[in-house]
Amino acid sequence: MKQTIILLYGGRSAEREVSVLSAESVMRAVNYDRFTVKTFFISQSGDFIKTQEFSQTPGQEDRLMTNETIDWDKKVAPSAIYEERAVVFPVLHGPMGEDGSVQGFLEVLKMPYVGCNILSSSLAMDKITTKRVLESAGIAQVPYVAIVEGDDVTAKIAEVEEELTYPVFTKPSNMGSSVGISKSENQEELRQALKLAFQYDSRVLVEQGVNAREIEVGLLGNYDVKSTLPGEVVKDVAFYDYDAKYIDNKITMDIPAKISDDVVAVMRQNAETAFRAIGGLGLSRCDFFYTDKGEIFLNELNTMPGFTQWSMYPLLWDNMGITYPDLIERLVELAKESFDKREAHLL
């Protein structure tokens, strides 16, 4: 009997378009000799719509249904996704997707799911909290100032200008895929950047700009996590924003990255240490800055990295000899393993 994968995609965050791209790639790459895929679209308003079911590889003309094509009469209660022995693959990015919300819901339903649990998802989603956890684990971070809604913005800008130097990068604490990120060269630009970031979150991070290469490491496993050789993001733009990443196609990747064996060893060790520090499960992508001074800063952990066929995470594992279909299969097995342990601990 085939294993059922419940594919959740869309979502309420600003990254829902990325989710659709990732989910379509998963839908096409699944080994249909072993799996059946059932899909549910989550609308921007949070509604669950039962969309499609695939028992064999979809044709090139097949697309996952989205706002423009779904049948709203197929809206269901969120709990309707439940199916005994099915594994959920929540291909959801950003808030209300990889921040622990959906993970908690799936645990209430007693369903195994791909990826990190409630705690590690919520920790990694919040950039400020992640930095504090990683600092306690002895992992170097880019200097930063945290600003929370309600703070005296003028005083915080003065703190930024005292502790950091321009340029600085301003980021919503709970957002991914470079949404809401701005580069500031002076105080006026910083004020505008803060206004933009606060549109997405009530907690904002201002980081020191660094001249650095962007290096990424893939992680796979539960308590026995393994890492990939690093890959490098090669940019044709000033910085890695949302449009460059997903719309303008101005990003290329160098896999493996052309860095020394010593640097590779440090990055892989730090990535695995960070994954364990947050209690990671299943998968993550660990992003580093490697400065022109030879400094290595861990930038962030993505617990549900972009999963399209051209995304860094699956390409990193392909370089290690694990194909995209095999990667999906391994993630399903890891989901079942972590579910069994979670249920055993509750007995």
From Swiss-Prot:
Write down the top EC class of this protein. ligase
Q: What is its EC number?
A: 6.3.2.4
Q: Which residues cross the membrane?
A: none
Cofactor or coenzyme needed:
Mg(2+); Mn(2+)
Biochemical pathway:
Cell wall biogenesis; peptidoglycan biosynthesis
Q: Give the GO molecular function terms.
A: ATP binding; D-alanine-D-alanine ligase activity; metal ion binding
* Recorded catalytic activity of this chain's protein: 2 D-alanine + ATP = D-alanyl-D-alanine + ADP + phosphate + H(+)
Keyword Electron transport included in the entry's annotation: no
One of its GO biological process terms is: peptidoglycan biosynthetic process
Q: Which Pfam families match?
A: Dala_Dala_lig_C, Dala_Dala_lig_N
User: Taking every annotated instance into account, which residue ranges of this chain make up the domain ATP-grasp?
Assistant: 131-333
Recorded hits in InterPro entries, A to Z, give:
ATP-grasp, ATP_grasp_subdomain_1, D-Ala_lig_Van_CS, D_ala_D_ala, Dala_Dala_lig_C, Dala_Dala_lig_N, PreATP-grasp_dom_sf
**SUPFAM superfamilies this protein is in?**
Glutathione synthetase ATP-binding domain-like, PreATP-grasp domain
Q: Name one GO cellular component term.
A: cytosol
List ligand-binding residues for ATP.
161-216
Swiss-Prot/TrEMBL keywords: ATP-binding, Cell shape, Cell wall biogenesis/degradation, Cytoplasm, Ligase, Magnesium, Manganese, Metal-binding, Nucleotide-binding, Peptidoglycan synthesis
State where the protein is found.
Cytoplasm
Report the SS bond pairs. Answer: none
Specify the domain of life of the species encoding this protein: Bacteria
HAMAP family on file: Dala_Dala_lig
Briefly, what is this protein's role? Answer: Cell wall formation.
Record's protein name: D-alanine--D-alanine ligase
